[in-house]
Amino acid sequence: MGLTKKEKVEKKARSVVKGKADKKAKVEKPSSKPAKSAKPSKSKDEVDELDDEFDEVEGLLEKGDVEEEDEEETNGNEDSEMSDDDEKDVEIEEEDDGEGSDLEEEESTAVVTTAPADAEVVHIASDAERKPFSTIPLSENTMQSLKDMGFETMTPVQEKTIPPLLAGRDVLGAAKTGSGKTLAFLIPAIEMLRKLKFKPRNGTGVIVVSPTRELALQIYGVARDLMANHSQTLGIVIGGNNRRQEEEKLNKGVNLLVCTPGRLLDHLQNSQGFVFKNLKALIIDEADRILEIGFEQEMKEIIKILPKERQSMLFSATQTTKVEDLARISLKKGPLYLNVDEHNVSSTAEGLEQGYVVCDSDKRFLLLFSFLKRNAGKKIIVFLSSCNSVKFYGELLNYIDLPVLDLHGKQKQQKRTNTFFEFINAKQGVLICTDVAARGLDIPKVDWIIQFDPPDDPRDYIHRVGRTARGSASGKSIMFLTPSELGFLRYLKAAKVPLNEYEFPNKKIANVQSQLEKLISSNYWLNTSAKDGYRAYLQAYASHHLKTVYQIDKLDLVKVAKSFGFNVPPKVNISIGASGKGAKSIKGKDNHKKRGGPGGKKFTR
C-alpha cells in the first residue's frame, strides 16, 4: 500500500543519521542573523525595581558593570534546564536494549529511605499538634522577630529540629518541601551567633548553601527578617551578582552568609579578605538538588576548605546515595536523622489534589490555552522542559493578549529576580518557567501547577507540585501526558504519588489551531522563536534518562510541530552525545516568511 500524505510528511521529518554518530554528519549551523523576538503587547521584561523590602540586597540589582556574569554557572550547573545552543552537545547515555534496562532506570531515580547506620533516628508525625515557639528557649530578640513575621506556632519539622540544633547536634533532615525547614535551620543559627556575640570583625560564623539563586534570595529574605532585632550582619553571594561588591562586603565582615556553591567556592579560594576561620555552622539546603545539577565536586572542595570543628546541618527532600555520601563527609559521626515522610502514605502534601490528562501532542497547546483562559483569575505555574520553549510560549501568549511572566536560566539575574518577586507579590497570574523555580521556593497562594512538559523522574514531579499546597494550604496540579508517556505513572505509583485522571471534552477545548499556524507562518519573529522552542523541546526530550518512557523515536513529529504552530515540522538539528557525536538532523519544511512585526493579536474562538 502507498503511504498517506501524513505518513510521507512524517517519514520525511524522521530523516536522521542512523546508528551511532557519524563523525562526518553534517550539522546545520545556526543562522548568523540574530533571532528577533516577538514583543508582547504588554511587556513585563522591564520592571524598574523590586519591592522596598528587598532593596537592601547590595549590588544585586546594580545596573552598572556586572563582573563575570554567570561565572558560577559556566557549565550550566545552576539550572537544570537543557542548554538551547545549537553548538552545545548534550550528554546522553546510550539506551540499553538488553534486559535489565528498566531496573537500571529505577535505581537511578531510587530514593534511599533508611537512615545512616550511625544516626539517631527521629520520626516526625506530620499531623502532630502544633506547639508555640514560646515552648523552646529562644532569645527575646528572635521571639520578637517571629512575632513581627506572623509566626506563633511551630511546624512538626521545626519542633523536632530546633531543640537539637540549639544543643549543637549535627542534623540530617529528610523533609518534604513546604515543611518549614528554612526557619528550622535559621533560628538555631541566628541564636548561636547572638550567644557567641559575633561582630563583623569576627568574620563569617554561619554559611547557608543553596542550589539556586532564587532559593538563596528567598533564604536571605527570611534571614533578614529574623535578624531584624539582632546586631549581627548578613550577606549573600550568588552567580550573576557583582563579584567585586560581594568581596568588599565580605571584607567588612558578614556573620551569616547565604550563597550558591560555585560563587562560595570562588570567594573561599580567591577573596583574600574573606574571614571564615571562625565558622561555627555549615547549612546545606536542598542537598539532593545541589548534587543533581552537578555541584558534587564543588561541595567536596568547600568542605575541605572550611574549618572541621563546626556544627553541620544537611537538609534534603529526598535521600539518595549521593546525599548519604555528602552527609558522611560533612556531618560528625552519630548525627540526628529526622524523617517526616517515611511513614506517610503520600510523598506529596496532604492538601494537594493532583491528576493527569492524556493528550496527543497536537492538542497540548490548545488544551493549555483553553485552561489558562478559563482560569484567568487564578495563580498558576506552568513548567516546561527548556529555556527556548519557555521563551516561545511566553512570547506567544503575551502576543495574543493572555499575559504571562516567564522565568528560565538564560535570563540575566536582574530579570530573573524581578520576575520572581513580581509573581510572589501577585494575587493572580501565570508564570511559565523551567525547573529553575521547582525547588524550595515559597510562592504564596498558588492555585494550580501545570506540568506542560513531563518531569524527568518522580523526584522532579514532587518538587514541581511542591510549589502549591504549602504548609496547611490547598492546591491543585495537573500533568500533561501523551499516550506513549503513560508508563511514567508506574514510577509515580512506586513513589507513593496518588493521581487521578482528568478528562477535558473536546467541545471545551478552543479550536484555534488554524489561527495559530497562520500567525506562526506570517510572523517572522514568532516563527523563529517557535523553531527554537521546537528544537529545544526535542533536545530536552532526548535527554530524559527514563528511556522506556520518553522515546524520541516514537514521537509523532507532525503532531509535536503543530503544538508549536507549524503545519509541517521545520528542519532542525539536535545534538545527542558528546563532541557532536550522534547529531540528528530532523528535517521538515522551513516555511517562515519574514513579515509581520511585534504587536498584539487575539485568537477568536
UniProtKB/Swiss-Prot annotation:
**Which residues fall in a compositionally biased region of kind Acidic residues?**
46-108
The main location is: nucleus
GO MF terms, alphabetically ordered: ATP binding; ATP hydrolysis activity; identical protein binding; RNA binding; RNA helicase activity
Which residues fall in a compositionally biased region of kind Basic and acidic residues?
1-31
Got a GO cellular component term for this one?
A: nuclear envelope
Cellular location(s): Nucleus, Nucleolus
What are the Helicase ATP-binding domain coordinates in residue numbering?
162-337
Quote the record's binding site residues for ATP. Answer: 175-182
Pinpoint motif Q motif by residue range: 131-159
Gene Ontology BP annotations: maturation of LSU-rRNA from tricistronic rRNA transcript (SSU-rRNA, 5.8S rRNA, LSU-rRNA); maturation of SSU-rRNA from tricistronic rRNA transcript (SSU-rRNA, 5.8S rRNA, LSU-rRNA); snoRNA release from pre-rRNA
Going by the UniProt record, its keywords in alphabetical order are: ATP-binding, Helicase, Hydrolase, Nucleotide-binding, Nucleus, Ribosome biogenesis, RNA-binding, rRNA processing
Annotated region (Disordered) at 1-118, 579-605
**Residue limits of the Helicase C-terminal domain?**
351-520
Q: What class of enzyme is it?
A: hydrolase
Documented EC number(s): 3.6.4.13
Biased composition (Basic residues) is annotated at 584-605
Name the residue ranges of motif: Bipartite nuclear localization signal. 363-379
Q: Which reaction does it catalyse?
A: ATP + H2O = ADP + phosphate + H(+)
* UniProt motif DEAD box: location: 285-288
Task: Return the InterPro entries for the record.
Answer: DDX18/Has1_DEADc (IPR044773), DEAD/DEAH_box_helicase_dom (IPR011545), Helicase_ATP-bd (IPR014001), Helicase_C-like (IPR001650), P-loop_NTPase (IPR027417), RNA-helicase_DEAD-box_CS (IPR000629), RNA_helicase_DEAD_Q_motif (IPR014014), SPB4-like_CTE (IPR025313)
Q: Name one Pfam family in it.
A: Helicase_C
The record comments on the domains as follows: The Q motif is unique to and characteristic of the DEAD box family of RNA helicases and controls ATP binding and hydrolysis.
Family, similarity comment: Belongs to the DEAD box helicase family. DDX18/HAS1 subfamily.
Tell me, in a sentence or two, what this protein's role is: ATP-dependent RNA helicase involved in 40S ribosomal subunit biogenesis. Required for the processing and cleavage of 35S pre-rRNA at sites A0, A1, and A2, leading to mature 18S rRNA.
Subunit notes for this chain?
Answer: Associates in the nucleolus with the 60S and pre-60S ribosomal subunits.
What is the name listed in the Swiss-Prot or TrEMBL entry for this protein? ATP-dependent RNA helicase HAS1
Species of origin reads: Yarrowia lipolytica (strain CLIB 122 / E 150)
Q: What is the lineage of its organism?
A: Eukaryota, Fungi, Dikarya, Ascomycota, Saccharomycotina
